[in-house]
Amino acid sequence: MDTRFHCVYLLTSLDPQCEGAHYIGYTVNPIRRLRQHNGELVNGARRTKRNGRPWLLLMCVSGFGEDRIALKFEWCWQNPSKSTRLKSHVSQLRCVHKLTHAVGVLLLLLRTELFSRLQLTLHIFDREHFDKVISQLLSALPTMEPLVETSLLRVESTTIEQFQTQYMNDGQWGAAVDYGAYFMRAPPGANVDVSKPIVGGQDNTLRCGVMHNNLCEEEVIRQHVKERTLLESGHYPCSLCSLPLRAPYFLRCSRTPFCRLRAHIVCLAMWFIYDSSQRGGDPLVKDAGPAEVAENSNDAACQVNENCYSLSGCGPVVGGIFNHDAYTDRRDDNSPPSPPCPLPTQSSQADASLAATSLPLVPRAPCDCPLCDEELQWSALVYDLKRRVAVEKRRAERERREAMDAEFAQRFQRLQSESNKKSTARERGALEGVRRKRRRRGEVAAKLTQQTAVRHEPTSGASGDRAHSAPPAPSCGGFDEIPANVTNPTAPLHADVLQVTEFNVDEWLNH
């Protein structure tokens, strides 16, 4: 849950040489950002530093629940020709330029389907300058529809001091309201005059405030992290029943973060119905006295309490909105427990039909916030809830994909390391085989060399001269030359052997 103040602002230059120059940006504190653009503080924009000073804060748009929506609004405002929501309508603004063109883009952007469903607020700081620009725009474009307030869009004229006091400073009640301590009206059925001012205040306007100006960014971030931790752990209480909320299935005020209203859907729906009944819009309380109003409101709350419990199965809700005693009395008569939604019993269906005929469960009329008296639109609250649920689902799906990708990468790395080990073992085995073959070939060559050397040695019975004489050198191309590839070579014949075995013809004839 983001508790920061997100807004998109429009600056215009007061320099006569830069008439019509403007700047569009996003910030969480437009007053401080204006001082940065004018050079009073550091970290200003480069574009506003070169020329155009001093700059005037003409307007800003607030009401964005998250920074992503505000940044998307800023980008569409800065790039209307590239935005899919404006590029088909921005052609009608060709005849206007500079500041008038920027204001015209804003009027078109506030009417788009995406941003028209949000409960936004347009803060105008210089009404005279704004009306002058609007008159120039409408005179140049007669077909352009003027800016009007709707049930979701609120336009207010303010000054920097009022804006600082109302949005940036602490509320009139001092520090931020702690969890569980709320300034609320009386619960349904209580005989209390709600027109009287609440205890601790002098009027019925703002009932709680949050600290922004007196806290640095680190403190705001720390508070945001604390609330998000409480939501994720299931310890953030509902503003109406004090039971824990389950993120993101809860409704919040459109003045977030200046209002800390966080409520269950059923609880806030009950508050809408109660507020409409107090205004006289419900037939149960029309033309009735104070006692009858209290009794009828209490009976209606009991009926919707039983119906909501039987349909949701979430248990009784305490804190003054639902009648816990009536529920306890109904549970003491040994009746079987009501099954959870979507399988209601016949009795719960009958109670639901009875409650539907007497009191609508889906609010239709706007209602004031029980904490800050801001006008709430049920459709805008439900749209914000659906958007947050969709964002949460996408975030969970993205985290799931990232976890799966990390697991697959880890498995692939493990398999790759195992295959590398096997390939290394195979390479080592092949290298060892090659070395073994080379070793065997060397041994065979050494044996052949030894045999050749032994056969070339002279016999022991030969004369000393022959024994000490050097062996004859082998003749090139003769029979004494031994080829290198002969495995069993024959020793050369000596002269003594030839003399003994030589055939003499004369001796043979004499015999």
From Swiss-Prot:
Subcellular location as annotated? Nucleus
Q: Which CDD domains does the UniProt entry name for this protein?
A: GIY-YIG_SLX1
The name this protein goes by in its record: Structure-specific endonuclease subunit SLX1 homolog
ZnF (SLX1-type) ranges: 238-372
Assembly, per entry:
Forms a heterodimer with a member of the SLX4 family.
Task: Tell me which InterPro entries the record gives.
Answer: GIY-YIG_endonuc, GIY-YIG_endonuc_sf, Slx1, SLX1_endonuclease
**What does it do?**
Catalytic subunit of a heterodimeric structure-specific endonuclease that resolves DNA secondary structures generated during DNA repair and recombination. Has endonuclease activity towards branched DNA substrates, introducing single-strand cuts in duplex DNA close to junctions with ss-DNA.
On the tree of life, the source organism's domain of life is Eukaryota
Judged by the first EC level, this protein's enzyme class is: hydrolase
Q: Cite the residue spans of the region called Disordered.
A: 325-349, 417-484
Per its UniProt record, the required cofactor names are: a divalent metal cation
Signal peptide extent: none
Q: Which UniProt keywords apply?
A: DNA damage, DNA recombination, DNA repair, Endonuclease, Hydrolase, Metal-binding, Nuclease, Nucleus, Zinc, Zinc-finger
Q: Organism classification, top ranks? A: Eukaryota, Discoba, Euglenozoa, Kinetoplastea, Metakinetoplastina
Is Cytoplasm tagged as a keyword?
no
What EC number(s) does the entry state? 3.1.-.-
Q: Set out the biological process GO terms recorded for this chain's protein.
A: DNA recombination; DNA repair
Q: A single Gene Ontology molecular function, please?
A: zinc ion binding
Which ranges carry the GIY-YIG domain?
4-87
The text of the family note is:
Belongs to the SLX1 family.
For this chain, the annotated S-S bridges are none
Q: Where is the composition biased (Basic and acidic residues)?
A: 419-434
GO CC, alphabetical: Slx1-Slx4 complex
